[in-house]
């Protein structure tokens, strides 16, 4: 039977994992949602094409997404230390998680918004709707189911990234799995942390998909 110290450590690891995942996803959407909207609007088939702006954001998104997350973690250590004063722990890990999440979210949002029927957008435009109204009242509303599915996928991805951050000083269940499973060869603790990560992932997926189904305008 494990000691109370190990049990408390795992409980703390769960909360740290939730903290990193949820905060990173929330802040990532603060950046990624507007970025995705701008990518959609400024594309050649968007409601306000702007080739230069689209290309700049497109390149930024591709560069960040093209760097493996474990390398991005190491690459951003100086920047993370500058922002939060240290490069280790759950709070510090949020910095690279947000930077990794934002362009990923932007692409998810762009993909969702481009699924909106062009006829619906044209109908709104013919009735005199402004671009802002088309974005907020038509595109985002029509794409809400796809956006919720994207958010669900994003949560799962960020959860995996948060676990990966344990390899370079991040907190949470990932750090416990690596410290005890890889370094100390305590397989039982590693297996429990992996199971807990799977459970968290399943909870995110189940809740997210139920919400997406609830707000599906086609039903």
Across the structure, where does each feature detected by a protein language model lie?
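Glycine-rich helix-loop "coupling/hinge" segments at transmembrane-helix boundaries
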Residues: 161-191, 195-196, 216
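Transmembrane alpha-helices
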Residues: 131-161
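Helix-capping/transition residues at the boundaries of transmembrane alpha-helices
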Residues: 64, 81, 124-126, 156, ...
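C-terminal transmembrane helix and the adjacent membrane-cytosol boundary/short C-terminal tail
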Residues: 38-44, 126, 190-219
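Short helix-to-coil transition segments within interhelical loops
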Residues: 113-143, 183
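Short membrane-interfacial helix/loop motifs at transmembrane-helix boundaries
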Residues: 1-8, 168
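Membrane-water interface segments at the C-terminal ends of transmembrane alpha-helices
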Residues: 9-114, 149-156, 196-204
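Hydrophobic alpha-helical elements at and bordering transmembrane segments
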Residues: 10, 14, 18, 56, ...
């Amino acid at each position: 039977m494990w000691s109370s110290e190990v049990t408390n450590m795992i409980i703390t690891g769960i909360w740290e994992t939730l903290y990193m995942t949820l905060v990173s996803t929330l802040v990532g959407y603060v950046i990624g949602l507007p970025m995705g909207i701008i990518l959609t609007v400024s594309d050649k088939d968007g409601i306000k094409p702007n080739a230069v702006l689209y290309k700049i954001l497109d390149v930024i998104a591709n560069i960040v997404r093209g760097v493996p997350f474990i390398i991005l973690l190491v690459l951003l250590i100086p920047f993370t230390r500058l922002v939060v004063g240290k490069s280790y722990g759950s709070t510090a890990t949020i910095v690279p998680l947000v930077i990794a999440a934002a362009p990923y979210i932007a692409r998810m949002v762009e993909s969702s918004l481009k699924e909106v029927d062009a006829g619906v957008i044209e109908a709104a435009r013919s009735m005199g709707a402004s671009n802002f109204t088309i974005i907020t009242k038509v595109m985002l509303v029509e794409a809400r189911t796809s956006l919720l599915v994207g958010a669900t996928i994003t949560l799962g991805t960020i959860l995996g990234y948060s676990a990966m951050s344990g390899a370079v000083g991040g907190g949470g269940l990932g750090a416990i799995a690596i410290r005890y499973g890889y370094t100390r060869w305590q397989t039982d603790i590693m297996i429990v942390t992996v199971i807990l990560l799977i459970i968290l992932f399943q909870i995110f997926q189940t809740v997210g998909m139920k919400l997406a189904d609830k707000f599906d305008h086609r039903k």
